[in-house]
C-alpha cells in the first residue's frame, strides 16, 4: 500500500488514556464488592477467588450463568439514565443460578461501547457494583471494549457472567415437584429486563438516536406523569431495576425451608419459565380470570399490554405479569414458607398449584 501513512490506535478511534481513566474511576466501586475469598484487585489477567471455603460442603457443585440486559438499554440511552442497568445485568445472572439454590460467589461484566468516557462508564459500573452488593457476590473482573466505527459513540451493550455454588444434597431439582404442590410468587418491580422489544414499539422509541433533539423530546415525553401509572412516569417505571432475590431466598433455604423448585420469570414470561421448574409429569395451573391475574399486576405491565392490545395468553408469555420469582412447595409447607418470607420482608402470594400433566403451564380460566 504505497499511499499508506502512519496511523495510531487513537487515530483509529480507540482512546486508551480515557480507558485508563475509566478503570481508575471504578476501582473503589469494585473493591467495595469484595468478599474474603477475593485475592488481589482488578488489573490482572484474571480474577482470583479462593475455593478453600468449599471444603466445608459435602459435595460442592459450581453453577454458572450468563446473560445481558437486552433492548432495555435502548431506553436507558435515550433517557441518558445509566445508573441502574448494571443492577439489571447482575440480576439476570444471579437470579438464574438462584433457581438451583446456588449462592453467587463472583461476577464479571463485559461492556461494548462506541466511545469510552470515564464518567459515563463509572455510572454503568456503579450499577453493576450495586447489584453485586445486593447479591452478595464479588465483582472480580470485567472488560471495557471500545468499538469505534462499529457502534455509535453513545451506544453500548452489556453482558455478565456469574459463578455460584450449592451443596449437591441441597440443590433444588424440578424432579421433586409433585401434583398438589403450591406455587408461590414474589413480586417484580415491573417489566424487569424482558419484553422491551415490544415496549419500544409501544412507546415509540424505535429509530431514535441517543443525544439527538428527537431523543431529548422523547425523554421529556416519557418523563411526564401518567394517571394510568398512579402518577408515575413511563421512564421511571420502565427503567426500574430488576429485583435481586438472592439474600432473602438463601436465608430462607439456610433456615431449612422445604422448597422443591424455583423459577426465575424472564424472557417468555410465566408461560415459558415456570415450566422449567416442573417435573415431566406435572403441570402448573396459574390463577387467571380473563385479563385479570390472581394477584396485583404492576400498572406499567397492564398499560403496555393494553396499548399493544395483547391477548391474555400473549401477555403471559411476554411479561412477568408482576411475578419475578416462583417457589414451588408442598401444600403442608405453604404456611410456614409464606410466614418465613414475610419475616424476611417479602410479600409472597399464591400463583397457582401443580396437577398431574406433562410439564406445561396452563391457566385456570382455560381449564
Q: Would you name each region that the model predicts?
A:
Residues 2-37:
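N-terminal amphipathic/basic leader segments beginning at the initiator methionine
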Residues 26, 48, 93-94, 199-202, ...:
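Buried hydrophobic packing segments
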Residues 2-11, 120, 124-138, 151-158, ...:
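Glycine-/charge-enriched secondary-structure boundary and capping motifs
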Residues 23, 122-125, 196:
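Hydrophobic face of alpha-helices
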Residues 12, 16, 80, 189-192, ...:
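Hydrophobic alpha-helical scaffolding
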Residues 66, 157, 170-230, 234, ...:
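Short, acidic (Asp/Glu-rich) active-site segment that either coordinates a divalent metal cofactor
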Residues 28-189, 285:
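Glycine-rich phosphate/pyrophosphate-binding loop regions near the starts of catalytic domains
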Residues 15, 67, 180, 264, ...:
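Residue-level signature of catalytic and energy-coupling elements of molecular machines
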